[in-house]
Amino acid sequence: MKPIAIQPASLTFNNEGTPVSRDFDDVYFSNDDGLEETRYVFLDGNQLPERFMTHPRDSFIVAESGFGTGLNFLTLWQAFAAFRDAHPDATLQRLHFISFEKFPLTPADLKSAHAHWPELAPWAQQLQAQWPMALPGCQRLVLDGGRVTLDLWLGDINELVDTLDDTHNRQVDAWFLDGFAPSKNPEMWTPGLFTAMARLARPGGTLATFTSAGFVRRGLIEAGFDVVKRKGFGRKREMLTGALSHDAPPPARAPWYARRPASGDKDVAVVGGGIASALLALGLLRRGWQVTLYCEDDAPAQGASGNRQGALYPLLSHHDAALAAFFPAAFTFARRLYDALPVSFDKDWCGVTQLGWDEKSQTKINQMLDLALPDTLAHGVDAREVRERCGVKTGCGGIEYPQGGWLCPAQLTAGVLELAQAHGLRVHYGHRVSALHREDLDWQLDFANGAQARHAAVVLANGHQLSGFPQTEKLPVYPVGGQVSHIPTTPGLGALRQVLCYDGYLTPQNPANAMHCIGASYHRGVSEMRYQEEDQQRNRQRLIDCLPAASWAQEVDVSAGDARCGVRCATRDHLPMVGNAPDYAATLRDYATLSQDASAPETVMPAPVLKNLFVLGALGSRGLCSAPLAAEILASQMSGEPLPLDGATLAALNPNRLWVRKLLKGRAAS
């Protein structure tokens, strides 16, 4: 797999303090008054914020062709905030901004550029605090308590727009066609971009751009926009505005992975009680849903989310494009979300080091390093550097994740649920769902205690019990039992400053209790776990066997029998299942000839699914990393919003993927 490295912008500041691109020899905004130019060209040119008052939906979606310093975004955010303050009961509640940038600014340059506009400081500071790493693809930033979403797509816009999945089609209410001047950057201003703009725009969706170049006007008209010239800003003679003139839906490109939003009332039952269900509930509540959580236990986080300490770091793969795309995005999203949550839980972003303790593990690490990821995400370390950073001798090098660390999943889950309850979540503990079935337009849930409930939609986020219903029993998931040992600190163990990963993992001590976590055992196919002394000893011995040069490892004492058992839900491809619950029988029936039909996707029926039934699970042992983004994807999908991953990666998360892959190859799905 060929790595794609994102290069930062190379810029300087001119005598007026305006940033200037060295690569394109052009200013990022007007020397005269960049803020007023943005208001005139992009806000006034799209009749904003006037359209906010009459907008019929709860979210207004803007797309932009060049993020640059973020001036357009910040100016629009300021206007949207003023609108929300003046009209808190308006239909429009949230702003969704999608932007593309090939050369993102460094954090320092971004801050310097923002110093130009003191009046934008309240919004600029929030953007700076969440400014993402330079990773290819989409980085979703959830701002202003969820009222503003920024999807920042890093890379070449003409390549990226073709990777957007079909949930982006006909979504954009307004386009900001910005970027360096066509004469300076002709590679961006292409017919392919104009066609993609039309595909993504809603019928009647508008556009505005600072240029009046003839080929731009003609290209937009050919793509389907009605385009007019108007007076340009300041000394510029003309600019262009327009609106999409046709209402022809674009053809689906991969209908076998089609994702459907929820329909009907925004009323959902979430079945679960762990971190995934808690974050999903919070995300749906912020989107105006009525959410009820049903948990079979008497308290939250009694399953795989109940550990005292869990490591947070991405799963990297040199061989699987979906893994390589999903987990870095998931990890960075998780860090931003955990840092922004107004929830108290034990954590330490102390870093994580994954060790190359033998030839096989070191080869794997070398392949990870070939991904050319930013050093702020992952970089190689030798044995000396491991000792300096981790505080203990291991005798081997590895790969360090400097922004990783550990957190307490049980406290996090409880805190998120408490926060969600403050926003209207209804929670019913001691409610085990024994059956699901459709009743008229709703789903009926039957509980083991004899109670019943009806909801318009249902999400199964119930861990290893995901496949425990007739509707989901064919999902290719499996349970993995495991045991984590809790060990007291010692002088040698107390020196550990980072999470160590080997053929197991060991956390630094939690200062709150002077205990470490070491684990975990792995029993595929085991759905009921009880304490095993053999697992306790195995957790200790794996550390000693992997790090024979580490004398401090001998201090690990598991004799107290202090441990926690749990069961994970996993898939063969190590990716979660996020999306509509697929209809297995209909998939086999409708896609019997998919291997032949796929050459003409416009003739293929959309993926058969069970209406308003969704799944969020199979998070395996990386739930702390994957749950936040997975929950965000599902909340967005159910609400009919654009999703924060490219189409190929979303397909790799689709619960029907393993069946469809076989059918596409002409093989039986079962």
From Swiss-Prot:
Record carries keyword Transferase: yes
Family listed: In the N-terminal section; belongs to the methyltransferase superfamily. tRNA (mnm(5)s(2)U34)-methyltransferase family. In the C-terminal section; belongs to the DAO family.
One of the record's GO molecular function terms: flavin adenine dinucleotide binding
Function: Catalyzes the last two steps in the biosynthesis of 5-methylaminomethyl-2-thiouridine (mnm(5)s(2)U) at the wobble position (U34) in tRNA. Catalyzes the FAD-dependent demodification of cmnm(5)s(2)U34 to nm(5)s(2)U34, followed by the transfer of a methyl group from S-adenosyl-L-methionine to nm(5)s(2)U34, to form mnm(5)s(2)U34.
Keywords, alphabetical: Cytoplasm, FAD, Flavoprotein, Methyltransferase, Multifunctional enzyme, Oxidoreductase, S-adenosyl-L-methionine, Transferase, tRNA processing
The keyword Transferase is assigned to this record: yes
EC number: 2.1.1.61, 1.5.-.-
Lineage start: Bacteria, Pseudomonadati, Pseudomonadota, Gammaproteobacteria, Enterobacterales
Residue segments, region tRNA (mnm(5)s(2)U34)-methyltransferase: 1-245
Protein's name according to its UniProt entry: tRNA 5-methylaminomethyl-2-thiouridine biosynthesis bifunctional protein MnmC
Localization: Cytoplasm
Reactions that this protein is recorded to catalyse: 5-aminomethyl-2-thiouridine(34) in tRNA + S-adenosyl-L-methionine = 5-methylaminomethyl-2-thiouridine(34) in tRNA + S-adenosyl-L-homocysteine + H(+)
Required cofactor(s): FAD
Gene: mnmC
FAD-dependent cmnm(5)s(2)U34 oxidoreductase: region residues: 271-670
Signal peptide residue numbers: none
Principal subcellular localisation of the protein: cytoplasm
SUPFAM superfamilies according to UniProt: FAD/NAD(P)-binding domain, S-adenosyl-L-methionine-dependent methyltransferases
